[in-house]
A protein has these predicted regions:
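Long helical/loop segments within the catalytic core of UDP-sugar-dependent glycosyltransferases
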Residues: 107-118, 122, 144, 149-223, ...
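Cell-envelope/extracellular polymer assembly enzymes that use nucleotide-activated donors
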Residues: 49-52, 82, 229
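Short beta-strand-to-loop acidic/aromatic patch adjacent to the donor-nucleotide binding site
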Residues: 129-141
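Acidic helix N-cap motif at the loop->helix transition within catalytic regions
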Residues: 65, 91-99, 145
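Short, acidic, metal-binding catalytic loop of nucleotide-sugar glycosyltransferases
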Residues: 69-80
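Active-site nucleotide-sugar/metal-binding loop of Leloir-type enzymes
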Residues: 120-132
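Membrane-embedded multi-pass helical conduit in multi-pass membrane proteins
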Residues: 29-33, 37-45, 299-379
């Protein structure tokens, strides 16, 4: 009787993990159909849209001035875009440097800071109407033709665009792994989705929205997972999210294990909260055949990849010792997951140097598993990631 219960539990756990593995494998295979992405046609005569560019900056004294200066080098008409920095808990010296630049410096005072509140404050303070709003992180660096390329893409009629966010640093094992993880996400949740007509996932920065839509929805944000909330709004309304694979946004990757854990804890909290909030609208999505919404709901229930690999390895070893025949299905899932993730990694990153970081990945995965108990189901607390 005891072994019967163990066997049933084993099968239930395996079935649950299979959902995550099957999802990853499917989109990894889809991504193989096009490694170059979908190219847009450069139309120089395209009329210039107007952009409001927002830089929420919470204690970002080390990076914000440099990021804004780099952005102002755009080869785009200066009267067609405006930069606003939401300066929260920053030094006076930083704000003075920003004030010397042709940008608007907003200085909100929040009892409890969050990126959502910063975006809400910015929209409430801006009086001019724009065509689009761009959201960047304080450490983000873009190329000089960023707005030009974005403008051309938007002329195809998109209301929401997620640009290709990629690593700008690889100064530690943690930052290398963080950068690889970012590219796997780009492959599975953005490029592959667009290839079969589904919406891309948002990522928190490098995002562009129709200004009217954004200004009417930003006030509805209530959690620290503002990008997931915006994504749900878009999917419920049937608005397609385009992934701009060739419009790059260079993002500083975390370099320390502590920052990595804080970041992942924030993401896990956002994922759990998003999944719970999406469930109540799932029946409506089925009735309306809203495939994007159903897909996103399934995506929110996936086990984080590093924890998935750790759990599959653990179960494979345990079942090999306890019941070898039962372990075959676990080893199969582990191998399939490994192959799928390998396919999702861009070829340029499949190097001996990257794969030598497996030990670091294992240590980070164990720490992540320990942090599960700290998940904030309401996801109201803002967890800041320092830039060293």
């Amino acid at each position: 009787m005891f072994w019967s219960y163990i066997h049933i539990l084993d099968l239930l756990l395996w079935a649950f993990m299979t959902i995550s593995v099957a999802y990853i494998t499917f989109y990894a295979l889809v991504s193989l159909f096009s490694r170059n992405g979908i190219k847009t046609v450069d139309v120089p005569e395209s009329p210039e849209s107007t952009f409001l560019v927002l830089f929420p900056a919470y204690s970002e004294d080390r990076v914000i001035v440099g990021s804004v200066k780099k952005f102002l080098l755009q080869n785009y008409p200066q009267d067609k875009y405006h930069v606003a920095v939401i300066s929260d808990h920053q030094q006076e010296s930083t704000e003075r440097l920003l004030s010397d630049l042709p940008v608007t410096v907003l200085r909100p005072v929040f009892d409890k800071s969050s990126k959502a509140k910063a975006l809400q404050y910015a929209i409430s303070e801006v009086s001019r109407q724009y065509d689009y709003v761009v959201v960047l992180d304080a450490d983000n660096i873009v190329e000089t033709d960023f707005l030009h390329r974005l403008n051309i893409l938007l002329k195809e009629g998109y209301k929401a665009v997620q640009c290709h966010r990629c690593a700008k640093n690889s100064d530690s094992s943690v930052s290398v792994l963080d950068g690889v993880s970012e590219e796997i996400n780009n492959t599975l949740f953005r490029k592959a989705h667009n290839l079969i007509g589904l919406s891309s996932a948002l990522i928190g920065s490098g995002m562009c929205f129709d200004y009217s839509w954004f200004s009417s929805h930003v006030t509805k944000l209530t959690t620290a997972g503002e990008d997931r909330e915006l994504e749900v709004f878009l999917l419920r309304e049937g608005i397609y999210i385009k992934y701009a694979d060739n419009i790059l946004v260079f993002d500083e990757k975390v370099s320390s294990a502590d920052n990595f854990q804080r970041q992942r804890q924030r993401w896990m909290s956002a994922q759990v909260n998003c999944f719970l909030s999406m469930l109540r609208h799932l029946p409506e999505a089925f009735v309306r055949l809203n495939v994007n919404y159903v897909d996103k709901t399934v995506q929110q229930m996936l086990v984080p990849r590093s924890m998935l690999l750790l759990f599959l390895l653990f179960m494979s070893l345990v079942m090999s010792a306890a019941a070898p025949w039962w372990s075959i299905k676990w080893w199969s899932l582990l191998v399939l997951t490994g192959l799928s993730l390998f396919l999702a990694i861009p070829a340029r990153l499949r190097t001996k140097s990257v794969f030598s970081k497996v030990g670091t990945l294992l240590r980070l995965s164990i720490k992540m598993a320990r942090n599960v108990r700290y998940i904030d189901h309401k996801n109201e607390d803002f967890i800041h990631t320092d830039h060293k």
